[in-house]
Amino acid sequence: MPPDERAPLPLPAPAPLTPPEGFAERLAAIGVTLDAAVIAKLGDYLARLLAMNELMNLTSITDPVEVWEKHVLDSLTLLPLLEELSAGARLADIGSGGGLPGLPLAIARPDLKVTLVEATQKKASFLVAVAAGLGLTNVSVRAERAEQLGKGDLCGAFDAVTARAVGRLVMLIPLTVPFVRPSGLVLLVKGQRAEEELAEASWVLGRQRAAFVKTVATPTGKIVMLRKSGEEPKRHPGR
């Protein structure tokens, strides 16, 4: 049974984290403005993430200031790249782990339908519970392997797909591109060696019918932006 059909795990509900001084200015520098209610919900998410991290490995970053910078700000750098998505558009976050960047995006863009794909059952159960605790009715969770979902019922089902800290681009591109429709966006959050990985993975782009658009700097690295340019290649028996 998928985790989003189960009763959510009971989660501790600690006091929300408050953003560090100057955080609104940091957001403005990347072209993002959020109201106080959204900021508060992001702080609520971070508090729950750190509380549950004491029971399961969700993040190696545990400093209350660093999580705003390296998790929230890093994730929200994707927001300006998603402006073309209208209300009701579908976004998949592959290998979501503790919910990054999918949950901050779902909090900031409640008009999007966000699917978090996480194969580890414990982490998927956390995602279900935290989405329920935050009242995120626009979030669903699939506790299955992305390799299978991208070939199955979620193939071509999304307008955009994101992934963060999942693997090198030569592996990540074939994993993520199948989820989006033709002309759909693929946004991959990488470290400082993104260009090196792009060169390594250049041959994969043509095979996956994907085109490189640009890279965008984040507080911790770069976002690689791709756009799917065609339908999925047909697979023939025996190949």
From Swiss-Prot:
It is an enzyme of class 2 (transferase). The keyword Transmembrane does not apply. One of its GO terms (molecular function) is rRNA (guanine-N7-)-methyltransferase activity. Keywords: Cytoplasm, Methyltransferase, rRNA processing, S-adenosyl-L-methionine, Transferase. One of its GO terms (cellular component) is cytosol. Specifically methylates the N7 position of guanine in position 527 of 16S rRNA. PANTHER family: S-ADENOSYL-L-METHIONINE-DEPENDENT METHYLTRANSFERASES SUPERFAMILY PROTEIN. It is found in: Cytoplasm. This is Ribosomal RNA small subunit methyltransferase G. It comes from Sorangium cellulosum (strain So ce56). It catalyses: guanosine(527) in 16S rRNA + S-adenosyl-L-methionine = N(7)-methylguanosine(527) in 16S rRNA + S-adenosyl-L-homocysteine. SUPFAM superfamilies: S-adenosyl-L-methionine-dependent methyltransferases. InterPro entries: rRNA_ssu_MeTfrase_G, SAM-dependent_MTases_sf. Its EC number is 2.1.1.170. It holds the Pfam family GidB. HAMAP family: 16SrRNA_methyltr_G (MF_00074). The keyword Transmembrane helix does not apply. Belongs to the methyltransferase superfamily. RNA methyltransferase RsmG family. S-adenosyl-L-methionine binds at residues 95, 100, 118-120, 146-147, 164. It comes from the Bacteria.
